[in-house]
């Protein structure tokens, strides 16, 4: 066996492939690296790469999670419809049950999402599958 490279292991998407970038503008991800990477410190599990909608954002604000208002002190620009963002898997699932779930980029959605939402449900919202 070879020596460890010191690099973290490749994280995989829900399709079992290396995870692709979700968004750099605005920069997203729990680690603010543009990817929906996750790890032990991500207690809220933010692995879902979604294209936000007005309906989802309004629903999120009414549930107490304001993703719209800029918070410059945290480097958060505020989000708008059309932005891509790494969402909490449980929040996406709740939005799905309420009929407000945004569409997804499965190639940029971390495989940990499958612990909350089945792949057949995710595929119904995929923007990047032909």
Regions found by a protein language model. Name each.
Residues 51-66:
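Short, basic/aromatic beta-hairpin or loop at an interaction surface
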């Amino acid at each position: 066996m070879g020596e460890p490279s010191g690099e973290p292991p490749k994280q995989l998407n829900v399709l079992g492939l290396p995870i692709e970038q979700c968004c750099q503008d605005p920069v997203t991800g729990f680690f603010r690296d543009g990817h929906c990477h996750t790890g032990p410190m991500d207690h809220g599990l933010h692995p879902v790469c979604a294209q936000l909608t007005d309906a989802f954002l309004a629903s999120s604000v009414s549930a107490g999670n304001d993703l719209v208002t800029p918070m410059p002190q945290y480097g958060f620009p505020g989000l708008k419809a059309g932005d891509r963002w790494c969402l909490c898997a449980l929040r996406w699932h709740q939005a799905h049950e309420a009929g407000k779930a945004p569409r997804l980029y499965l190639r940029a959605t971390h495989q940990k999402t499958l612990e909350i939402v089945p792949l057949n449900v995710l595929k119904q919202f995929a923007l990047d599958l032909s």
